[in-house]
Amino acid sequence: MAELTINADDVRIALNEFAASYEPGNAERVEVGRVTTAGDGIARVEGLPSVMANELLRFEDGTLGLAQNLDVREIGVIVLGDFTGIEEGQEVHRTGQVLSVPVGDAFLGRVVDPLGQPIDDLGEIKAETTRALELQAPGVTQRKSVHEPMQTGLKAIDAMIPIGRGQRQLIIGDRQTGKSAIAIDTIINQKANWASGDVTKQVRCIYVAIGQKASTIAAVRQTLEDNGALEYTTIVASPASDPAGFKYLAPYAGSAIGQHWMYGGKHVLIVFDDLSKQAEAYRAVSLLLRRPPGREAYPGDVFYLHSRLLERCAKLSDELGAGSMTGLPLIETKANDVSAYIPTNVISITDGQIFLQSDLFNANQRPAVDVGVSVSRVGGAAQVKSMKKVSGTLKLELAQYRDMQAFAMFASDLDAASRQQLTRGARLMELLKQGQYSPFPVENQVVSIWAGTNGYLDDVPVEDISRFETEFLEHLKHKSSILTTLAQTNVMDDDTAEALKTSIVAFKKGFFGEGDNLLVGAGHEEYAPIDEAQVDQEKIVKQKR
């Protein structure tokens, strides 16, 4: 047997070579939590000491959850999906990612859930990138003042409560008063801008449906498609059947999709329909997470819930691409009470509100905008010059009309000036009526309001105002270049006003028929004047007691 000899120098050299070439492996630490309780869309998980706020967690059946309450021993988790398969004792793993949604132009024309997954059976969506749901709003130095108009196509709003790109304008009112109709009309009115192909004019729209019936969301999608507006609109849907966690997240998902376009230098319009249901969903989630309740059982941070959402709507500075995101949050009131908790919160956050009155709606004044309570705090700077000129006195005249109308209910005899106010006010109110899904181009609005405020409709019967307006605009479209000039210049100068005056005087003669009595025409018979002696008159005598 050969003798084994060990040379110390060889051993030392071998050890040095091994030590020089040794690379330690990466040590991995896997945190595993366990479900302690689960139910009602909420799970409590113990373990996972390094979890982040708003981090995504994965349950055994693949369902995702959102870490919310980070307590000493356990975590309160909002389950994002079906929670029936989650049971006590199951393992929970970290993903190391915060909640984000895919974004990109491929989302236009699609219906997605709050996680960005398509639910319209039209196949997968190829996303450009992803964006976190909880994003910091642009800072003060990153913003620019609102100065570009966001036309709604509604005369009552564009004339008296103008909205600018980057503004947050609240639409508030009781149920069934036309809140969603105003928002959808505004989306439809962007069709001409989209068809122009000009990026500075185009507006990408996002409609966030929170807690609505699935049939209602399907009807909205069909309406947008029928009016050619779906191609530039994304619908983020969280119907009533969704868990409360999805309804809470849906507005943030819509904002993340919109911010991707805004930071790309594009213009975005986002509708939140409606934030009352989001607040109720957040209240349900917070109570299930055992957070202390406050006023009306809402958690203490319910104001922050809406403020951090709506502050993401902005007009960006030129250095950041000059993009914008305009927000139209909707709030439902009870019995026209705008002093409730959530309505007052959102009123204080937004740049103005459009208040819809149920009494006006029931009186067939639609859109049922209460001009006295509605206001736009920053949109006036974005109003086009021609509209600003013709609508300057409109709000005042309508306010005087409402006061005089209330007074006339108790007065038996009015002077000529008061009767004139009532006559013109009734015609202006009729002029502001507008059918659903029929937005007006701004030049048509300017002509209609100019005719009303300058008294050219005072001798037109109230029931004929709508027909007169339609036929006069059609007359201008084919017989004059006034509408084209207004659309190109957005200026109502003396020459344009004089041309309009000549056109409307000539048109009225044809509308009513020739003659001095303009009320004689179709549907109006001419009678001989009655002698005063033949009229039985009653005299009301008031005696002081």
UniProtKB/Swiss-Prot annotation:
Main localization, broad class: membrane
Subunit structure: F-type ATPases have 2 components, CF(1) - the catalytic core - and CF(0) - the membrane proton channel. CF(1) has five subunits: alpha(3), beta(3), gamma(1), delta(1), epsilon(1). CF(0) has three main subunits: a(1), b(2) and c(9-12). The alpha and beta chains form an alternating ring which encloses part of the gamma chain. CF(1) is attached to CF(0) by a central stalk formed by the gamma and epsilon chains, while a peripheral stalk is formed by the delta and b chains.
Gene expressing this chain: atpA
Protein's name in the database: ATP synthase subunit alpha
Site keyed Required for activity: positions: S374
Species assigned in the record: Arthrobacter sp. (strain FB24)
Gene3D superfamilies, per the entry: 2.40.30.20, ATP synthase alpha/beta chain, C-terminal domain, P-loop containing nucleotide triphosphate hydrolases
Family: Belongs to the ATPase alpha/beta chains family.
NCBIfam families per record: atpA, PRK13343.1
Annotated compartments: Cell membrane
Catalytic activity: ATP + H2O + 4 H(+)(in) = ADP + phosphate + 5 H(+)(out)
